[in-house]
Each structure stands twice: as structure tokens, then as C-alpha cells.
Amino acid sequence: MFLQDLGWSGFFAAQLHSAPDPNPDSTPAGVPGRVASANHGRFLIWTEAGTIDAGVSGTLRNSGALWPAVGDWVIVRPEDAVIDRVLNRQTCVSRKQPEREIREQVLAANIDVLFIVSGLDRDYNPRRIERFLVMANESGARPVVLLNKADLAESLGLNLTEIVASVQQLSPAITVLPISAKSDENLDALPSQLGPGQTAALIGSSGVGKSTILNRLLGDERQATGEVRASDSRGRHTTTSRQLFRMPASAANQSGWLLMDLPGLREVQLWANPDKSAGQPTQTLEASFDDIQALAASCRFRDCTHTAEPGCAVTSANLDPARLANFQKMQKELAHLERKTSPRLAKETRAKWNAIEKSVRSHPKRSS
């Protein structure tokens, strides 16, 4: 297989000589490869010469550098089956770990298109779609919303045209595709969303049909699928790990492309790269809310948080209350995350409280 067919580009090629070899005395030299799957510290790596089941070198393990994730490009030594280095990512889909500790969980690396899958049954939730759109915007991947189970729209009494239009209004620049993994409706439109050798990932809740979509596109039952409870449209976690698949060439994409199936997400907690978004969590969020971004330009204060400030054009506008509340909720999440992860803000916060404590000590409360 050729590296270009796996997503290799000049962005990664330029990094080959941008850092010293961590093992300059090792022979043979490492070769570039892409992480196709990961399982308990072992990684399946695709290279031009074939597939390698590799571990991580001690140098990389102890360096504090990037840890390999599915979709990553790495430098691997075929003879030793060891990964020496992870190349910088072009895009990165992440969330905050669903636990109290503030940590990033990388869901997918080097994704060009993020297919946000929502079922048209009881899973349909515009507020959750908004969260996924923010996640995609932060990652650098292009979001495409897939409204699955379109074949059920009529039986559920839904106006499919109106639903597509309402999702499109969430972010006018995005592509929204009604599909049916069960009947193959509109699935042939997915390959045309990517260029040759590009990579997409399927993301959404459990039971929305991600694995079924993958199987239909592959023409093979490669991923297990589960039944969905009719009472609440909830599904079981049938996909438990991340894995890349090479998709067959088609009329829409003659060179083929790659698709990653992600486990269903019960929680969509946002993550913002501290270096990328330092000092501007609101600006990062506003990019996913076109209407709010346009209104924010007319706010009286440049650093308006769109909550209680006078002269706020956002809170004064006739916005959907649920949409505005969702924006404000995510804004608080990102601001809290930045305070916890930004060294600059942590230092400023400590200085602020030190000044307050010093002031209290210098001006003790007088007894009456």
C-alpha cells in the first residue's frame, strides 16, 4: 500500500527531519506508518511494507511526548516492532475524560471529516448536535451531520425536510445528509465528502447506527451491531475500541478513503487545547454558533460573556432560548477548563487570591 492512500501528506513529510532521531545508534532506521488500532499498549501500524504489531519504545514512554492514538502517524522500527516517535497531529478530536480529573482523551487523530451521526428516533437532540459541532470545530476536522434512520421519518410522524432545515440552521456552513443505514438510502453520498486518501470518523451516541453504516459501506459485517430499545432508542456499546478501515474505491471516490468507527459516547464533555485557545474560550465557541458570533460584534464590551452585561447584543436578541442556554453552558465549561489547564490563568488566579489575602491581613476587621 502507498502512504498517500493512508492519508500521508506534506504536513507529515516535513516533520521527518524536523527533530533528532531518539535512537541515533539504532539500525535499521524507522519508517513512517499509521496507527490503525490500539489495544492495551499494542498498536497495529500500517506501513508501505505491510502491517506491524508494535509496542512503544522506552524512550518514548518516558519522554512525556505524544502517546499514540488511532489515526496517528508514527515512526516505527520494523525489525524491533517499536514506535519511536509520534508525528504532530494535523487535527485531533478530543473530549475531557468523563471523570473528575482534568485530562484530555484523544478520540481520533488526523481526521479530515467528522461524521456526526444522530438517529431520527428518540436519539435526535439538537443540543447534542451543537456539542459535537463545537468538538469538530475545535479539532480542525470538517463536520458533516448524518441524520440516520430517515426511513422511519414517516412512521414517526416527522417532516424530514423541516428537520434537515432546522439542523442546517445550527450552522449554515455545514453539510446535513439524511440517510438510512438499514435501506442504504443516501449512503453513496458519504464517499464524495472526502478526497482521495482522506480520513473520516463516525461519532455519536450508542445505538445511532454507526457500526451499521460502516458495515454497509464496507459491504461486509466487520463491526458488531446491537439492538436498540424501542422505549428510549438507547443502544448497547457494541463498538468498544477505535479502529481504522480502508474503504473500497467507488464512483464518488475512485482512490478509496479511510473510516474510523468510534465507541458510542454517553458524555460529550468539551476539551480545548490550552495552547491553541488560551485566553479565548468564548471566541472558539462562537465560531460554532454563527448567529451568536455575528451578534457579538455589536456588544458594548469586547470581552462580553453574553450573560449579564449591559449592552449585550446576544442576550438582547430574539434567539432560541434553548440554543442560547446551551451556548452559555458550554461557555462556562470551556472557561472552567481553561482556568484548570492554562498555566498563565492559574498564575493570575493565584496572584489574585494572594493579593486578596494580603489585603485582608493588612486591614483586619475592627471589632465594634
Write out the residue ranges for each language-model feature.
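Conserved ATPase-coupling elements of RecA-like P-loop NTPase cores
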Residues: 125-126, 155-161, 269-273
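Conserved beta-strand/loop subsegment of P-loop NTPase cores
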Residues: 110-118, 138-150, 171-179
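Histidine-anchored nucleotide/phosphate-binding helix
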Residues: 127-142
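Helix-rich effector regions associated with P-loop NTPase G domains
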Residues: 2, 24-29, 63-80, 86-107, ...
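A conserved segment at the C-terminal end of the G1
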Residues: 210-226
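N-terminal accessory targeting/assembly segments
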Residues: 1-126
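Canonical P-loop GTPase G-domain recognition
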Residues: 152-208
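Structural motif
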Residues: 115-117, 201, 259
